[in-house]
Curated annotation (Swiss-Prot):
It catalyses: a quinone + NADH + 5 H(+)(in) = a quinol + NAD(+) + 4 H(+)(out). It comes from Yersinia pestis bv. Antiqua (strain Angola). Keywords: Cell inner membrane, Cell membrane, Membrane, Multifunctional enzyme, NAD, Quinone, Translocase, Transport, Ubiquinone. This is NADH-quinone oxidoreductase subunit C/D. Disulfide bonds: none annotated. It is a peripheral membrane protein. Residues 213-598 are annotated as: NADH dehydrogenase I subunit D. The lineage of its organism: Bacteria, Pseudomonadati, Pseudomonadota, Gammaproteobacteria, Enterobacterales. In the N-terminal section; belongs to the complex I 30 kDa subunit family. In the C-terminal section; belongs to the complex I 49 kDa subunit family. Residues 1-189 are annotated as: NADH dehydrogenase I subunit C. Coiled coil: none annotated.
Length: 598
């Protein structure tokens, strides 16, 4: 197991570092020579290395094959660099592509960047090294117009096939009022419907064999078992799945584009909608990344309050997941019990934040307000109620022989496959990999809590759902510690960029009154830099990679969600299985389409 004391997460959050002392920089220099790279100093907590386009695949292969390899392509996307003013010391670039690699054995990350000219937006595909680069490269091409040479199927993934332009370019409008009014004529509707017709040849599929034709079946985008606006086209021989093509993007809302026109403060409500069951869990990585940019260290009370709200939302999400999984297998009753239990969670959340699903309650430098009187009683009542209810779910449903017969050994994959496809959360831990960000890279004071990380052995549907049950128990354990050990102190940091600033000062000092007005109306100005924060969200690892150009809003907001990677893995897991197995597999993934499509 990796020595957690070596993790960069224990370094001061405000520290800008080039990470030249990281062993991987020495390894790269020894292999390729120090002149082959430009190392960028950031607040991401990892080495950020610009490499030559011609050497990119060689560098990635080298890192992939090291004794302690970088086994996961955690993220891949682009940046339009043309309007960036604070880029001194970096390679000249109109656009750039970044590759975020993760090593489990080292418990470390590295980010590779490639500079591109607007006249030559080409880079080689990484799909032969990391198969999960497929969807990320498709999205990067779609959003920026960067071509990945050798990609097996470089087509649109988020936007309709008829869409024109590349939305994340800086010269692409960010507001609907900048477009002509949209009119859907009958002719245009027919063309849009025709574009959705699945053509097997486009995906390298055969329509049949010499003796019989294959059936092509649309599951979704309005099927109850697809868990949202998600379409998956199945190639069937009888009920056996020969192959399938997931089709996403129906829930895309341009969340990353919105980050470029909202202030650092006013973007917080948008984070709640990324994974709409996660509530405050979604806000955590964003505010932590902004606080790294600002150099804010929050009081212990803020850390503990944030942990408490995050674990309440984790329980709320897990309850829905467990009960709907049971429903997908065929048992209806547990869903109704779960909504009773979730209401008790919402009672606590609503009393504290004033809202239920989308509280937008975390703030830059703190939380919106202090805990209300009586929060302890509400939390105590829930902690006394929930353990016995959880036992009843296990006894009445999850130990049922029919449920186990439908899920044990179904849609199983191993640790190597999970890492290759970017699987995180319970989906990865079900294969025996004990990687939980709260333990391995503690944030918001998680290092002060006593809890276990449940792991599985088989990597199948049953392991995944039972891990969620055990995670729910550990969340209750964390909440018990919040109840008993809530620190005293302020609910906001004493820092100039805390937003909004403490209200009590605004009527005493003209300086703070002006600051309050500017930060609420225009937004705080963050120092030019880059920051990154990953957290253990309800469905896997969620992260924000923020680029500030010294303005009141983000220059580039990259949101990496777990569900996107998990859906891309589906074909590799389900080929050769039955349609009924796919239904159970989809239920075991734990995804919502807002998390996929952003």
């Amino acid at each position: 197991m990796t020595d957690l004391t070596t993790s960069d997460s224990l370094q001061p959050a405000w520290q800008t570092r080039d990470h030249l002392d990281d062993p991987v920089i020495g390894e790269l220099s020894n292999r390729f020579g120090p002149e082959a790279f430009v190392v960028q100093a950031t607040r991401t907590g990892m080495p950020v290395v610009w490499v030559k386009r011609e050497q990119l695949l060689e560098v990635m292969s080298f890192l992939r094959k090291q004794p302690k390899p970088y086994v996961m392509l955690f993220d891949l996307h682009g940046v339009d660099e043309r309007l960036r003013t604070h880029s001194q010391g970096l390679p000249d670039a109109d656009f750039s592509v970044f590759y975020h690699l993760l090593s489990i054995e080292r418990n470390r990350d590295i980010m590779l960047k490639v500079a591109l000219s607007e006249k030559d937006l080409h880079v080689s595909t990484a799909t032969k090294i990391f198969p999960n680069a497929n969807w990320y490269e498709r999205e990067t091409w779609e959003m920026f117009g960067i071509t990945f040479d050798g990609h097996p199927h470089l087509t649109r993934i988020m936007m309709p096939q008829s869409w024109e332009g590349h939305p994340l370019r800086k010269d692409y409008p960010a507001r609907a009022t900048e477009f002509d009014p949209y009119v859907l004529t009958k002719q245009k509707e027919d063309l849009e419907m025709e574009s959705l017709t699945f053509k097997p040849e486009d995906w390298g599929m055969k329509r049949g064999t010499e003796n019989e034709d294959f059936m092509f079946l649309n599951l979704g985008p309005n099927h109850p078992s697809s868990h949202g606006a998600f379409r998956i086209v199945l190639q069937l021989d009888g009920e056996e799945i020969i192959d399938c093509v997931p089709d996403v993007g129906y829930h895309h809302r341009g969340a990353e584009k919105m980050g470029e026109r909202q202030s650092w403060h006013s973007y917080i409500p948008y984070t709640d909608r990324i994974e709409y069951l996660g509530g405050c869990v979604n806000e955590m990585p964003y505010v932590l990344a902004v606080e790294k940019l600002a150099g804010i260290v929050v009081p212990d009370r803020v850390n503990t309050i944030r942990v408490m709200l995050s674990e309440l939302f984790r329980i709320n999400s897990h309850l829905l997941y467990i009960s709907t999984f049971i429903q997908d297998v065929g048992a209806m009753t547990p869903v109704f019990f779960a909504f009773t239990d979730r209401q008790k969670v919402y009672d606590v959340i609503e009393a504290i934040t004033g809202f239920r699903m989308h509280p937008a309650w975390f703030r830059i430098g703190g939380v919106a307000h202090d805990l209300p009187r009586g929060w302890e009683r509400l939390l105590r009542d829930f902690l006394d109620w929930m353990p016995k209810r959880l036992d009843s779910y296990v006894k009445a449903a999850l130990q049922n022989s029919i449920l186990k017969g439908r899920s044990v050994g179904v849609a199983a994959y191993n640790a190597k496959e999970a890492l290759e496809w970017g699987v995180t959360g319970a989906g990865l831990r079900a294969t025996g990999v004990e990687f939980d960000v709260r333990k391995w890279r503690p944030y918001s004071g998680y290092e002060n809590f006593d809890f276990e990380v449940p792991v599985g052995n088989n990597g199948d549907c049953y392991d995944r759902v039972m891990l969620k049950v055990e995670e729910l128990r550990q969340s209750l354990r964390i909440l018990e510690q919040c109840y008993k050990n809530m620190p005293e102190g302020p609910f906001k940091a004493d820092h100039p960029l805390t937003t909004p600033p403490p209200k009590e000062r605004t009527l005493q000092h003209i300086e703070t009154l002006i600051t309050h007005f500017l930060q609420v109306s225009w937004g705080p100005v963050m120092p030019a830099n880059e920051s990154f924060q990953m957290i253990e969200a309800t469905k896997g690892i969620n992260s924000y990679y923020l680029t500030s150009d010294g303005s009141t809003m983000s220059y580039r907001t990259r949101i990496r969600t777990p569900s996107y990677a998990h859906l891309q893995q589906i074909p590799s897991v389900i080929r050769g299985s039955l349609v009924s197995d796919l239904i159970v597999y989809l239920g075991s993934i734990d995804f919502v389409m807002s998390d996929v499509d952003r």
